[in-house]
C-alpha cells in the first residue's frame, strides 16, 4: 500500500508547479479531477492534481518537483488502457496537443513519434510509403503512441514479431529523477554511461544474474513464445547484452513505472495494398483450433477466433450473414485475412490457404473476398462482439474484457476450461474471441460491483482463471492489455518467485523512491484487483451503456476546452449518484461545473456516436438536459417558429445594419463597440467578428421563375442561413449561395422547384439544439410536408445547400424522399451534365461533422480534388465547434476546436471550402482566409457538357 500524503504537500506542490506551468493547466477542482481521472478500466482513483503538460521541460520540472516532496505520479496518454495502469490518487500527468510531433525517416522505413500521436495518425503519415507501425491495437483510432509503447500493445495482425518490443529503434527517456537519455544520440548515451553509471552497472548485474540462472533464462525464453505483457519485459535481460538496448526494451511495456517515454522511433512494417478476408465456420472449437495450427503454416496475416456465444451475440446485427443466426453454441468461426503486394499473389495465397484446409469440414463460410463492403461486414462481426455484450448489460454493471494467451497446442482445451468457469460462476453472457495464431484470447463478460457478494464472485473467478492460465497451461495472464492493477496480484503466480524478484529489482533500480505509478505491475496488496472499483450508477438510458472507453474523445471539439463525451458522462453519472443518495447538488461545485463544461460547451453534433462502440450520442443527453435550462424561453421560441418568416426578416435586417455600421464606422470601431457590449453583458450578447456575413439580398423566387424549364428537375431548399446570409466582405466571389446554386443547376440543365412559403420553413435544428424537441419536430413536419408536395411525392431529388440541415431532415423525415447536400447532389446528378476544368490552386477543405456522419468525407474530398490541383484537409479538426449559433454565443468552443487550423494553411493558399454557411464564418475567422460553400468552387470550374458529349462520352470519375 502506498502511504497517504498530507494535503499540505499537495498544496506546496501546486505552488511550486505554478511558478513555471500555466495555472490553467494545473487542475485541482474536484469535478474536473474526477472527470480527467477516469480511464477505460473498471478502477476509480481520483487524483489530487491533474497536470496538462506541453513540453519536455515541463515534464522534467513536474517529475523533479514531485520527487522533492515524495509525491507519487502517474502518466496518462489517451486513457484507453483496460487494466488500471493509468489511474492515480495522487498526481496524474497528461499531455496537451503539443506532443503530436512526428518525422518519417528513410523513406518510411522508420518513424519518429512523440507520445501524443494517435496510432492511426502515425499510419496515415506512413501510408504514402506503403508502411505502417507494427502494433495494431483495436483502439488504434484513439490510443496514443505513449500508451502503445508503455503497454507493448499489439493487435490482430501484429503478433509478437511486430510489437513495440520487436520494432523499437530508440527512444528519449525521462527517468524518475528527471534525467534525460536519448538512446539514439551517441553523445547522450556516452554522457549517461558516465553520469548514471549506477543504472548501467545495475542493468549489467541483472543481465548477469539472469543468464547465470539457466532455469530462469529458459523460462523467460519459453514464456515469450507467446504474447506476454504480464510484468516487466524480462526477455530484454536475455535478448540483449548492451545496457542501453536492455534499458530501451525494459521501457517497453513498463506502464509508466520506470520512466517517461518522451519520444520513440519505430522500425515500420509493410502495409500491403492487397488484402482478402474469409469467414470459416467449424462444428466445434476443437476443429477450429486444429485448423489454426494448419493456418499458421500458410500465408495468412490474421486469424481471429470466435466461439459460438460470440457469434450469437452479433447474429441480429445489420448485414450479418444469415447462417450466423442458425449456428448452435458449439460452433466456432475463424476470420482469416491474407495480405500481398499484388492481386495475383493474393489470389495464389488464398488458394494455398483453402487447399491446406481441405481436410477440415467447414460447415458454413463466406469465401475469400477483397470486395470492400463484404470485408467490412466480416470484420464488423469480430469488432462488434465487445460492444454487443456492452449494449445488453444490466444498468449498473460494467463490461470486463480479459486478455490471456494459451500455448496454441492447448487452445481448444483452454477455451473449454474457460467456458466451464463461465458456467461455474454464472457468467452466462460471456463470450470468447481473439487472435488465434498467437493463442491470444479475449473473454468478455458483465460484472456488477455494487454488492460485496458480486465483488467476491469476481475475485474467486479471477483466482480460478489465474490458476488455469498461468499454472495449468503455463500461459500469459495478460497478453496485450498490460498488467496494471488488474493482474498485479498474480504476477508472482505466473512468473514464480525468482522471476518476480527480478522484477522487483528492476523497479528498485529505476525507481528507488517508488514514486512512478505505484501499485501497477509490482503490488504487494493481493486484493488490489478488487479494490477501488469504479461505480457505474444508472444516469439516463441515453448513456447508461457507456463503458467509458474514450473512443469518442479524438473527434470532440470541446475536449481541450472543457470536457470530452466520456468525461461529460462521468460527471453526469456522479451527479445522478448523489441525487439518488438524497444529496442536494443544486448549488454544488459539481453542478456548476457541469452547467458550463457539460452543457454549454457541448456542440451536440453527434460525432462521438460515430466512434462509440455502442453508438452513444452524448449530444442527445446534452440536448435533453438543455430542455430545462431553456424552458423559460419556450414561449419566445414558439413565437419565432410560428412567425418564422418575420423572424428571419429581422435577422436579415440585423445583418444589413451591421453592414451599414461597418461601412460608416469601420470594422475596428464596430468590433470594439459590439464586443465591449458583450463584455459588459457577461457574454449575453453575441460575439462580433470581421467575418460577419452581409445580408442576402438575392431574389431567389424571381430568379427561379426566369430559369428555363427542363425534364430534369430538382427541388431546392436553401437553409435559413443561406436565405439570409450573404458572403463576408473579403470573399472574392460576393454572390450569395442561393445565386451560385442556381447558376450551377442551370449549367447542368436542371429546372429548379422551390417549396411553397419558402421563407417560413426550417428543419428545426435551431430549436432541437436547445432541447426544444416539440417545436423542432413541428418545424420538421411542416418542412417534410412542403417538400413532399414540391417533389411530387418524392419523385424529384431535394437539395439542401447546407449539410447539417440535410442530415437532420434525413433522420427526421418519414416519407420516402431523396435528401441531398451539395456534395451528394453534384456527385449523383450534376456531374454527368458538366465538364470540370480544375484550377491549378491549393485550397483548404473542411468536411463538416454532419457530412462525416452522412459518410460523405471521401466523396467531398474527391469532388474538391476534381476542382483544384491541391486540396488540404487539416489534421485534427473533425468538428469546427460552431454548432449553429455557438460560434457567436460560446466562441471559445469554436476557437478550441480549430485552434490548429491557421498554422496548417499554406502561405500560397487564399481560400477554403465547406458546405455549411455558419461553420464557414468560424473557419474564415480562425484561418485568416475566406471559406465558402464547395458549390462556389464547382460553379467556378464547371461548364455545361454539350449534348453531343453527353451522348458519346462515358461519365468519367470527376473528369
What are these regions (language model features)?
Residues 42, 82, 87, 126-170, ...:
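A gly/ser-rich beta-alpha-beta helix-loop segment of oxidoreductase catalytic cores
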Residues 518-520, 551-575, 601-628, 808, ...:
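Iron-sulfur cluster-binding cysteine motifs and their immediate structural context
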Residues 17, 41-73, 91, 95-137, ...:
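N-terminal glycine-rich flavin-associated loop
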Residues 1-64, 78-109, 257-275, 310-329, ...:
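N-terminal flexible segment immediately upstream of the FAD-binding catalytic core
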Residues 522, 559-594, 615-640, 932-939:
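Non-heme iron-sulfur electron-transfer modules
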Residues 528-548, 582-604:
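Ferredoxin-like iron-sulfur electron-transfer modules
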Residues 511, 619-959:
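Iron-sulfur cluster-binding electron-transfer modules in prokaryotic oxidoreductases
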Amino acid at each position: 500500500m502506498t502511504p497517504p500524503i498530507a494535503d499540505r504537500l499537495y498544496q506546496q506542490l501546486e505552488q511550486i508547479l505554478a511558478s513555471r506551468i500555466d495555472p490553467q493547466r494545473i487542475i485541482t477542482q474536484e469535478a474536473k479531477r474526477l472527470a480527467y481521472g477516469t480511464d477505460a478500466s473498471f478502477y476509480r482513483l481520483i487524483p489530487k492534481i491533474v497536470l496538462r503538460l506541453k513540453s519536455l521541460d515541463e515534464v522534467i520540472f513536474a517529475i523533479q518537483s514531485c520527487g522533492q516532496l515524495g509525491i507519487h505520479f502517474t502518466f496518462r496518454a489517451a486513457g484507453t488502457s483496460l487494466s488500471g495502469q493509468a489511474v492515480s490518487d495522487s498526481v496524474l500527468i497528461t499531455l496537451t496537443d503539443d506532443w503530436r510531433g512526428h518525422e518519417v525517416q528513410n523513406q518510411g522505413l522508420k518513424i519518429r513519434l512523440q507520445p501524443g500521436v494517435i496510432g492511426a495518425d502515425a499510419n496515415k503519415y506512413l501510408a504514402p510509403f506503403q508502411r505502417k507501425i507494427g502494433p495494431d491495437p483495436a483502439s488504434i483510432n484513439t490510443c496514443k503512441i505513449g500508451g502503445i509503447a508503455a503497454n507493448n500493445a499489439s493487435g490482430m495482425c501484429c503478433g509478437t514479431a511486430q510489437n513495440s518490443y520487436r520494432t523499437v529503434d530508440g527512444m528519449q527517456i525521462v527517468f524518475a529523477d528527471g534525467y534525460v537519455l536519448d538512446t539514439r544520440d551517441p553523445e547522450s548515451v556516452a554522457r549517461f554511461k558516465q553520469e548514471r553509471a549506477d543504472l548501467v552497472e545495475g542493468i549489467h548485474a541483472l543481465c548477469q544474474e539472469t543468464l547465470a540462472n539457466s532455469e530462469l533464462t529458459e523460462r523467460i525464453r519459453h514464456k515469450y513464445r507467446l504474447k506476454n505483457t504480464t510484468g516487466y519485459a524480462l526477455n530484454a535481460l536475455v535478448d540483449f547484452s548492451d545496457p542501453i538496448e536492455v534499458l530501451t526494451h525494459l521501457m517497453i511495456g513498463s506502464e509508466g513505472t520506470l520512466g517517461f517515454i518522451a519520444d520513440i522511433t519505430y522500425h515500420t512494417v509493410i502495409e500491403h495494398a492487397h488484402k482478402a478476408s474469409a469467414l470459416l465456420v467449424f462444428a466445434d472449437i476443437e476443429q477450429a483450433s486444429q485448423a489454426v495450427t494448419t493456418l499458421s503454416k500458410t500465408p495468412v496475416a490474421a486469424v481471429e477466433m470466435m466461439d459460438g456465444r460470440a457469434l450469437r451475440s452479433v447474429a441480429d446485427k445489420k448485414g450479418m450473414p444469415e447462417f450466423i443466426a442458425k449456428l448452435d453454441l458449439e460452433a466456432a468461426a475463424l476470420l482469416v485475412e491474407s495480405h500481398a503486394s499484388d492481386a495475383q499473389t493474393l489470389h495464389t495465397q488464398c488458394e494455398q490457404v483453402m487447399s491446406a484446409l481441405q481436410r477440415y469440414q467447414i460447415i458454413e463460410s463466406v469465401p475469400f473476398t477483397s470486395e470492400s463492403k463484404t470485408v467490412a461486414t466480416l470484420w464488423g462481426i469480430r469488432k462488434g462482439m465487445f460492444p454487443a455484450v456492452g449494449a445488453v448489460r444490466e444498468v449498473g454493471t460494467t463490461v470486463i474484457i480479459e486478455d490471456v494467451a494459451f500455448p496454441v497446442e492447448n487452445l481448444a482445451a483452454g477455451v473449454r476450461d474457460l467456458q466451464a468457469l463461465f458456467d461455474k460462476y454464472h457468467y452466462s453472457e460471456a463470450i470468447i474471441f481473439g487472435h488465434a495464431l498467437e493463442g491470444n484470447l479475449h473473454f468478455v463478460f458483465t460484472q456488477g460491483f455494487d454488492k460485496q457478494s458480486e465483488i467476491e464472485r469476481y475475485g474467486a473467478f479471477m483466482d480460478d482463471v489465474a490458476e488455469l492460465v498461468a499454472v495449468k497451461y503455463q500461459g500469459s495472464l495478460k497478453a496485450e492489455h498490460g498488467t496494471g492493477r488488474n493482474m498485479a496480484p498474480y504476477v508472482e503466480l505466473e512468473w514464480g518467485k525468482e522471476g518476480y524478484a527480478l522484477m522487483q529489482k528492476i523497479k528498485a533500480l529505476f525507481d528507488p523512491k517508488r514514486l512512478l505509478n505505484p501499485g501497477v505491475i509490482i503490488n504487494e496488496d493481493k486484493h488490489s484487483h478488487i479494490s477501488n472499483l469504479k461505480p457505474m450508477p444508472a444516469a439516463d438510458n441515453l448513456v447508461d451503456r457507456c463503458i467509458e472507453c474514450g473512443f469518442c474523445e479524438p473527434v470532440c471539439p470541446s475536449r481541450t476546452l472543457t470536457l470530452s463525451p466520456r468525461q461529460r458522462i462521468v460527471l453526469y453519472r456522479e451527479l445522478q449518484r448523489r441525487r439518488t443518495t438524497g444529496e442536494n447538488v443544486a448549488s454544488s461545485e459539481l453542478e456548476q461545473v457541469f452547467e458550463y463544461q457539460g452543457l454549454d460547451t457541448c456542440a451536440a453534433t453527434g460525432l462521438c456516436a460515430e466512434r462509440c462502440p455502442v453508438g452513444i450520442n452524448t449530444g442527445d443527453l446534452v440536448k435533453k438536459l438543455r430542455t430545462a435550462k431553456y424552458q423559460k424561453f419556450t414561449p419566445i421560441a414558439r413565437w419565432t417558429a410560428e412567425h418564422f418568416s418575420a423572424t428571419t426578416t429581422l435577422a436579415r435586417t440585423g445583418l444589413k445594419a451591421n453592414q451599414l455600421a461597418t461601412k460608416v464606422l469601420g470594422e475596428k470601431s464596430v468590433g470594439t463597440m459590439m464586443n465591449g457590449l458583450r463584455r459588459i453583458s457577461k457574454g449575453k450578447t453575441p460575439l462580433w467578428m470581421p467575418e460577419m456575413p452581409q445580408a442576402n439580398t438575392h431574389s431567389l423566387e424571381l430568379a427561379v421563375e426566369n430559369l428555363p424549364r427542363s425534364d430534369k428537375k430538382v427541388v431546392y431548399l436553401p437553409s435559413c442561413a443561406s436565405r439570409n446570409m450573404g458572403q463576408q466582405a473579403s470573399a472574392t466571389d460576393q454572390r450569395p449561395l442561393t445565386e451560385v446554386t442556381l447558376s450551377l443547376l442551370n449549367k447542368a440543365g436542371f429546372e429548379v422547384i422551390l417549396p411553397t412559403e419558402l421563407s417560413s420553413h426550417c428543419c428545426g435544428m435551431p430549436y432541437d439544439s436547445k432541447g426544444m424537441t416539440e417545436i423542432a419536430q413541428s418545424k420538421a413536419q411542416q418542412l417534410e410536408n412542403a417538400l413532399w408536395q414540391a417533389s411530387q411525392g418524392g419523385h424529384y431529388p431535394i437539395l439542401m445547400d447546407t449539410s447539417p440541415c440535410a442530415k437532420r431532415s434525413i433522420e427526421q423525415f418519414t416519407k420516402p424522399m431523396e435528401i441531398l447536400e451539395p456534395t451528394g447532389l453534384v456527385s449523383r446528378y450534376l456531374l454527368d451534365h458538366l465538364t470540370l476544368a480544375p484550377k491549378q490552386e491549393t485550397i483548404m477543405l473542411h468536411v463538416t461533422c454532419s457530412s462525416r456522419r452522412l459518410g460523405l468525407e471521401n466523396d467531398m474530398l474527391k469532388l474538391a480534388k476534381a476542382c483544384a490541383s491541391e486540396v488540404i484537409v487539416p489534421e485534427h479538426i473533425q468538428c469546427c465547434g460552431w454548432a449553429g449559433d455557438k460560434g457567436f454565443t460560446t466562441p471559445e468552443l469554436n476557437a478550441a476546436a480549430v485552434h490548429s487550423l491557421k498554422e496548417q494553411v499554406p502561405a500560397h493558399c487564399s481560400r477554403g471550402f465547406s458546405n455549411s454557411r455558419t461553420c464557414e464564418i468560424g473557419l474564415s475567422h480562425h484561418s485568416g482566409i475566406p471559406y465558402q460553400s464547395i458549390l462556389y468552387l464547382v460553379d467556378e470550374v464547371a461548364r455545361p457538357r454539350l449534348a453531343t458529349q453527353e451522348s458519346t462520352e462515358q461519365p468519367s470519375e470527376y473528369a
